From Swiss-Prot:
NCBIfam families per record: MnmC_Cterm, PRK01747.1-2, PRK01747.1-5, tRNA_MNMC2
This protein's encoding gene: mnmC
Function: Catalyzes the last two steps in the biosynthesis of 5-methylaminomethyl-2-thiouridine (mnm(5)s(2)U) at the wobble position (U34) in tRNA. Catalyzes the FAD-dependent demodification of cmnm(5)s(2)U34 to nm(5)s(2)U34, followed by the transfer of a methyl group from S-adenosyl-L-methionine to nm(5)s(2)U34, to form mnm(5)s(2)U34.
Protein name according to UniProt: tRNA 5-methylaminomethyl-2-thiouridine biosynthesis bifunctional protein MnmC
Top-level taxonomy: Bacteria, Pseudomonadati, Pseudomonadota, Gammaproteobacteria, Vibrionales
Cofactor: FAD
Family: In the N-terminal section; belongs to the methyltransferase superfamily. tRNA (mnm(5)s(2)U34)-methyltransferase family.
GO biological process, one term: methylation
Record region (tRNA (mnm(5)s(2)U34)-methyltransferase): 1-246
InterPro entries documented for this protein: FAD-dep_OxRdtase, FAD/NAD-bd_sf, MnmC-like_methylTransf, SAM-dependent_MTases_sf, tRNA_MAMT_biosynth_bifunc_MnmC, tRNA_MNMC2, tRNA_S-uridine_synth_MnmC_C
Catalytic activity: 5-aminomethyl-2-thiouridine(34) in tRNA + S-adenosyl-L-methionine = 5-methylaminomethyl-2-thiouridine(34) in tRNA + S-adenosyl-L-homocysteine + H(+)
Length: 674
């Protein structure tokens, strides 16, 4: 599958009417006369919106568009949907999902300038500006209006992106906006592959409208399965075409060995856990109207690996754009957006001060220089000379580095506890503390899971295991090939010099700037696979300080790091060998072992055996703060049958059964642990 490495911004000019014009395609982005009126006529009216929304019994309505451009179509339909919801608060349709593809996204400054033309859309445009993503390939998800509206921006050529949109057999899209520059200006886009791809993603009865009346477009859409007709064009334009998918041919691009299932009619869910994975998932499901019950073995949230005072937030990138990099780049941008939205509702210690990774030895230098060859946007990551690093960090290090200007740190404990307490106050979550779940049993007659805690039994429609390193306490997830690594973080008092550190510093360890709340830094963290208890480790405490001294031997200020107070915190990370989380339906180990024992010889794999209505969100490792929000969004989308925020090939890389499948494909037998 083709992997895009970088995205170019649109090159714009502005004509006498103040309309943006593409230098690449020599065409206007919208009508010189009244672009907003044209959008409403061509795309809303001809797709029968908002009338269709009144009788729609779905929870979420999905629109897909072939060219985002200035976002005019999106802003117009967002405005219409808000008006619909305000006028019809009891309607079954609750959410709007807008998927758009764009090869040359506008820069943020050009987007803001273009939006000056429509003051009536200003309140929506400003929200879009706030979270408009960097130009990173593939899907960038933006959640707006507390989940009322979701925007998926697929950056890249539509011919490469469209096949990556994960699609179940019944289809995904309710209405297509076939937009973009005129076929005469951009003939490469308007072709039969596009029309066929639109039909593959469409549901039965999906409508379609486009401003053009070109015969080859109409014939191509008809050949793809759409019933198209000419209708009166907007303003002085004589004709345009509109129609609907008359016959849906079942299609899926999801491999049977990596299939996933929604929980039909999902109303309530039990989450087993209590850390950042549980808190982000509970928040994301609550936005979708799902009632959440949390079962936590501890006396309050964030007592495990999510309980640290300060944790760094920055992406894990690779110059070759491997799967880890392709997951973490959008995950980090989504985390930034998600955390900023959380900060509008709850208080937690955090600072977007940037993260600086030092080239402290030859190995680190080679690794970081290789990463910079990935041609990432400079706002995401860029290199710094030794002198620039000194200025950025605030204390002398005299090492070159890479800097993540959008990174920073936050308090995982405060964020996790704040999110869960907010949901409790809102009546969206019921928490049961000191309630470890001992066993799960599927009840076929009721189609419910029975949970046992001691002598107490509870029943739930759906269950998510998000219990970190305790994943193996339940038989259904005990065989997942995950590891456990203890980490100790040291809390050190600041000094006059240490207080000048103004960026998270990463080397063979990490050190945060001082927290203004408590006057302490966090420095860490140890990696111990042998001892998984929560007891203080004096050797780890000493090594946390020594790592900094070892990496910066010429500097004197690291000697001010004082760990002698033995203030620290211990936690156990849940880690995967490939550095990616396990997100999705839980597979039945014993059945998979049997059904796939000759997978290497199978031409077409049979659908993988999954436990009904059982999911996992585990293996977040050391970068959980950067990945948890998007992984929670991905899992909630999967559970609810919504469009997915990552490409179908990346979903395979996150599937909880992936390592079993890989091994069986090689003709190797599964042992108890892969």
């Amino acid at each position: 599958m083709f992997i895009m490495s970088s995205i170019s911004h649109a090159q714009l000019g502005w004509n006498d009417a103040g309309t943006p014009v593409s230098d690449q395609f020599d065409d206007v982005y919208f009508s010189n006369v009244n672009g907003l009126a044209e959008t409403r006529y061509v795309f809303l009216e001809q797709n029968h919106l908002p009338q269709r929304w009144h009788n729609d019994d779905q929870r979420r309505f999905v629109i897909a568009e072939t060219g985002f451009g200035t976002g005019l179509n999106f802003l117009a339909v967002w405005q219409a949907f808000v008006a619909f919801r305000e006028a019809n608060p009891d309607a079954k349709l609750k959410e709007l999902h807008f998927i758009s593809f764009e090869k040359y996204p506008l820069s943020k400054s050009d987007l803001i300038q273009a939006h000056q033309a429509w003051p009536e859309l200003a309140q929506f445009a400003q929200k879009l500006h706030k979270h408009y993503p960097l130009a990173i390939p593939e899907c960038q998800r933006i959640v707006l209006n507390d989940g009322l509206v979701t925007l998926d921006l697929w950056f890249g050529d539509i011919k490469d992106c469209l096949p990556k949109v994960a699609t179940q057999e019944q289809g995904l899209v309710d209405a297509w906006f076939l937009d973009g520059f005129a076929p005469s200006k951009n003939p490469e886009m308007w072709n039969q592959n596009l029309f066929a791809g639109m039909a593959k993603l469409a549901k039965h009865g999906c409508t379609c409208a486009t401003f053009t009346s070109a015969g080859f477009v109409r014939r191509g859409l008809i050949d793809a399965g759409f019933a198209m007709k000419k209708v009166k064009g907007f303003g002085t334009k004589r004709e345009m075409i509109a129609g609907s998918l008359s016959e849906k041919v079942p299609y899926t691009n999801i491999a049977p060995e990596f299939r996933f299932e929604a929980t039909h009619g999902l109303q309530e869910v039990a989450i087993i856990g209590g850390g950042i994975a549980s808190a982000t998932l509970a928040t994301t499901l609550a936005r979708r109207g799902v009632a959440v019950t949390l079962y936590c073995a501890d006396e309050k949230p964030a007592q495990g690996a999510s309980g640290n005072r300060q944790g760094a937030v920055y992406p894990l990138l690779s110059g070759d754009h491997n799967a880890v990099s392709r997951v973490f780049a959008p995950a980090f941008l989504f985390a930034r957006q998600w955390i900023e939205q959380a900060a509008e509702q709850i208080n937690f210690d955090h600072d977007w001060c940037g993260v600086t990774q030092l080239m402290w030895d030859e190995k680190a230098t080679d690794k970081l220089k290789s990463m910079l060859e990935g041609n990432f946007p400079t706002q995401l990551v860029h290199g710094l000379s030794a002198e620039q690093t000194n200025q950025q960090v605030g204390v002398p290090v005299d090492k070159a580095s890479v800097h993540y200007p959008l990174g920073g740190w936050l308090s995982p404990a405060e964020l996790t506890q704040g999110l869960i307490h907010l949901l409790e106050q809102q009546g969206k979550l019921t928490a049961h503390y000191q309630t470890p779940i001992d066993a799960l049993t599927w009840q076929p007659e009721t189609q419910l899971w029975q949970l046992r805690s001691g002598d107490t039994l509870m029943s739930h429609q759906c269950v998510v295991i998000a219990s970190g390193h305790q994943f193996d306490s339940l038989s259904q997830t005990a065989e997942l090939p995950l590891g456990k690594v203890k980490g100790q973080v040291s809390h050190i008092p600041t000094t006059e010099t240490l207080s000048k550190i103004n960026s998270v510093l990463c080397y063979d360890g990490y050190m945060t700037p001082v927290s203004q709340q408590n006057g302490y830094h966090c420095i860490g963290a140890s990696y111990d696979r042998q001892h998984l208890d929560a007891t203080f480790d004096p050797q780890a405490q000493h090594e946390n300080a020594q790592k900094l001294i070892h990496c910066l031997p010429e500097q004197t200020w690291p000697l001010e790091v004082d760990v002698s107070g033995n203030q620290s915190r211990q936690g156990v990370r849940c880690v995967s060998r490939d550095h990616l989380p396990f997100v999705g339906n839980v597979g039945e180990f014993s059945k998979i072992t049997e059904q796939y024992r000759d997978l290497a010889q199978q031409h077409q794999a049979e659908p993988i055996a999954l436990y009904p209505q059982l999911y996992a969100l585990v293996g977040l490792g050391s970068r959980g703060l950067s990945s948890a929000p998007l992984m929670a969004e991905l899992l909630a989308s999967q559970m609810c049958g919504d469009p997915m925020p990552l490409g179908v090939d990346l979903l395979e890389q996150l599937h909880p059964s992936r390592m079993w499948v890989r091994k069986l494909r090689k003709g190797k037998a599964l042992t108890q642990k892969v």
